[in-house]
From Swiss-Prot:
It is found in: Secreted. GO terms for cellular component: extracellular region. It comes from the Eukaryota. Its main location: secreted. Induction: Inhibited by citrus PGIP. It catalyses: (1,4-alpha-D-galacturonosyl)n+m + H2O = (1,4-alpha-D-galacturonosyl)n + (1,4-alpha-D-galacturonosyl)m. It comes from Diaprepes abbreviatus. Its EC number is 3.2.1.15. This is Endo-polygalacturonase. On the 2D-gel the determined pI of this protein is: 9.4, its MW is: 44.5 kDa. One of its GO terms (biological process) is cell wall organization.
Length: 9
């Protein structure tokens, strides 16, 4: 999963 908050997938 990729989120703009975490910036990781």
């Amino acid at each position: 999963i990729y989120t703009y908050v975490i910036g990781r997938g």
